[in-house]
From Swiss-Prot:
Source domain of life: Bacteria
InterPro entries named among the record's database cross-references: DNA_mismatch_repair_CS, DNA_mismatch_repair_MutL, DNA_mismatch_S5_2-like, HATPase_C_sf, MutL/Mlh/PMS, MutL/Mlh/Pms-like, MutL_C, MutL_C_dimsub
Entry keyword set: DNA damage, DNA repair
GO biological process: mismatch repair
Gene Ontology MF terms: ATP binding; ATP hydrolysis activity; ATP-dependent DNA damage sensor activity; mismatched DNA binding
Residues spanning the signal sequence: none
GO cellular component: mismatch repair complex
SUPFAM superfamilies attached to this UniProt entry: ATPase domain of HSP90 chaperone/DNA topoisomerase II/histidine kinase (SSF55874), DNA mismatch repair protein MutL (SSF118116), Ribosomal protein S5 domain 2-like (SSF54211)
Name assigned to this protein: DNA mismatch repair protein MutL
Family to which this protein belongs: Belongs to the DNA mismatch repair MutL/HexB family.
């Protein structure tokens, strides 16, 4: 009797589903790719409970015949390749014939479909991979696939699903990537009856970018274009001033397929050269057209990994295209835009604001116990408002022509203003930023800071500054050189550590609320983690699609820090999958102290420098910044005398060496 048997087809499909269908977003990806292959111009994705309860994909594509419909649930049955040679010239997104049978094997599946030349359509109902119903039905041309109770017969997979918000964020990300890959298709994503994403299908990639990432982002994207005998490279990349804290905003497309490729990511960063800050990444959509013979798609069932011939040549082409496009741009940021952002952040509501012009000198306010810059205030008329949703949903306006007439209802509405992200080029280069991914290093840093003991600081008499970076002071033990950035970073850290730890209900109302704009997936992820922001006194409320409004701020946060501070907190929160409020507060204090401190090459007047030393003396540990760097070094009087050879080393006698 043989011990090797051929597995039943349903069981084989469930095994295949383990690789192909990882989560609800995987189902959305596979079914939408099928709709794209069917030459659809409109695709609607509807989900309930993040896709675990229901996923429905409706398209207006070619549809399937009554005879082909049951064959579509057979494993490795496909209309996209017919011979071995076809495997090396694949132009469709699907070709393996695994997705639909895999989905059917772990859910209840209903398919309604019709072709243009058929007298009637067809309906198929399957449960657990077994066909229960197949009959004629009246239905529009195209296909509607409904997936219900996903993973109902694979409880182990269901057990390891993340929260509904996290799964929804993955679905939004998949639809966004496919929308960028195919701007000629009108995509709509509806979750629990609420529309989350809609693109016009006008074929304008910049307009698709505006619908997904927002108008502010789309306006700061520049197009790239280059080609050689094997590749055509196009798309959009962000200006160096517009970056993110991770690579999630980089989208690489090959022949309309979204892929993941480390080397091509590296080529994009190389195209920016030194224009990017360390640890910052651009927003990019790189569309690559390639001869199918040069790309092997048959690497993994998810088809997100591709082996590319002449990969080095493609990397060089991408880097050159980006660097040349950046070279043609005026990379000097507009001063008024950097300071006010009024022209790019107030397009749904009018705005009134004043623009501080920052000089190079810092001053100290003894009443507020903090540093400030003398400001020249420039008044500016409120710009015309324009409607974000109307622009994206209608598909008839271009991003470059954004102004619409201000209506009476808009004029009567309370003023709000879009917050601007911090410019990474203005961040300090004193030391690498806080690496929240390095859990071991982060834990060691937090333990060291938590166990600090009170230190005694010497009395110092300030007498000068060098290169706008180092302060000189003398004391009983000689000369002291103080790193002004590290010194104020320590002062700020202990301030924020105490204030954030004492967060209560003390909030200050904002005269003009701020709007904070995020991508769809980030917006959903932040909603899930909003309790952590609430714990530190930040209360963001949803305000339209992909936007939060901030109406009040904690009293420990200065109003000048709100825009950049809230964005920095949100970016850090998005980078950390799981974090305790204690750890989050500690990380937040370190980050804010670094961002808010005096930088190198910044002149201090004598009074401000002396006040900084007085504040430093009051710190629990005045000798190290939160990252562990020394705040000050000391040359004793004896050290100075040795350096100037005022003290001669005694000659060591032979008797002292023990020879006699």
């Amino acid at each position: 009797m043989t011990t090797i048997i051929e597995l039943p087809e349903v069981l084989a499909n469930q095994i295949a589903a383990g690789e192909v269908i990882e989560r609800p977003a995987s189902v959305v990806k596979e079914l939408v790719e099928n709709a794209i292959d069917a030459k659809s111009s409109q695709i609607t994705v509807e989900i309930e409970e993040s896709g675990l309860k229901m996923i429905q994909i409706t398209d207006n594509g070619e549809g399937m015949s009554h005879e082909d419909l049951p064959l579509s649930l057979r494993r490795h049955a496909t209309s996209k390749i017919k011979s071995q040679s076809d495997l090396f010239r694949i132009r469709t997104l699907g070709f393996r014939g695994e997705a639909l049978p895999s989905v059917a094997s772990i859910s209840k599946l209903t398919i309604k479909t019709a072709t243009a030349d058929a007298e009637h359509g067809s309906i198929l109902v399957a449960s657990g991979g077994k066909i229960e119903q197949l009959e004629a039905v009246s239905t529009p041309v195209g296909t509607k696939i409904k997936v219900e109770n996903l993973f109902y017969n694979t409880p182990a997979r269901l057990k390891y699903m993340k929260s509904l918000q996290a799964e929804l964020a993955h679905v939004v990300d998949v639809v966004n990537r496919l929308s960028l890959a195919h701007p000629e298709i009108a995509f709509t994503l509806i979750s629990d009856g609420k529309q989350l994403t809609q693109t016009s299908g006008a074929g304008d990639l910049r307009q698709a970018l505006a619908g997904i990432y927002g108008l502010n982002t789309a306006k700061k994207m520049i197009d790239i274009s280059s080609a050689d005998l094997d590749f055509e490279v196009g798309g959009f990349v962000s200006l160096p001033e517009l970056t993110r804290a991770n690579r999630n905003y980089i989208t690489i497309l090959i022949n309309g397929r979204y892929i993941k490729n480390f080397l091509l990511n590296r080529a994009i960063l190389d195209g920016y050269g030194s224009k990017l800050m360390v640890g910052r990444f651009p927003i990019a959509v790189i569309d690559i057209q390639i001869d199918p013979y040069l790309a092997d798609v048959n690497v993994h069932p998810t088809k997100q990994e591709i082996r590319i011939s002449k990969e080095r040549e493609l990397m060089a082409l991408i880097s050159t295209a980006i660097s040349e496009s950046l070279r043609e741009q005026d990379l000097i940021p507009d001063a008024l835009e950097n300071l006010a952002r009024s022209s790019t952040r107030s397009f749904s509501k009018p705005e009134q604001t004043s623009l501080p012009l920052q000089p190079s000198q810092l001053y100290y306010d003894p009443q507020k116990n903090d540093f400030f810059t003398k400001e020249t205030v420039v008044s500016e008329d409120s710009p015309q408002g324009f409607n974000h949703e109307t622009l994206v949903d209608s598909g008839v306006k271009q991003v470059d022509n954004l102004q619409l007439a201000k209506t009476e209802s808009e004029a009567a509405a309370p003023s709000v203003k879009y917050a601007s992200r911090p410019d990474p080029m203005l961040s300090d280069g004193e030391h690498p930023g806080l690496d929240v991914h390095n859990k071991q290093k982060l834990s060691q840093m937090l333990d060291r800071l938590e166990n600090e003991e009170q230190s005694v600081f010497p009395e110092l008499d300030y007498f000068g500054q060098m290169h706008g970076t180092y302060l000189f002071a003398q004391g009983r033990d000689g000369l002291f050189i103080i790193d002004q950035h590290a010194a104020q970073e320590r002062v700020k850290y202990e301030y924020y550590r105490d204030k954030i730890g004492e967060v209560d209900n003390s909030l200050q109302q904002l005269l003009v609320p701020y709007l904070f704009e995020f991508s769809g997936s980030d917006f959903i992820n932040l909603q899930e983690k909003m309790s952590l922001l609430n714990e530190v006194g930040i209360y963001l409320e949803p305000y339209g699609n992909h936007t939060f409004i901030l109406r009040e701020h904690p009293i420990w946060m200065k109003e000048a820090e709100i825009e950049s501070g809230v964005y920095e907190m949100c970016d850090m929160l998005l980078l950390t999958n799981e974090v305790s409020i204690k750890t989050y507060r500690a990380e937040l204090a370190i980050m804010m102290s670094c961002k808010r401190s005096i930088k190198a090459n910044h002149s201090l007047d004598d009074y401000s420098a002396r006040q900084l030393l007085l504040q430093l003396a009051q710190c629990k540990n005045p000798y190290n910044c939160p990252h562990g760097r020394p705040v000050l070094i000391n040359f004793s009087k004896a050290d100075m005398e040795k350096m100037f050879r005022r003290i001669q080393e005694n000659h060591t006698s032979l008797r002292e060496l023990g020879k006699y």
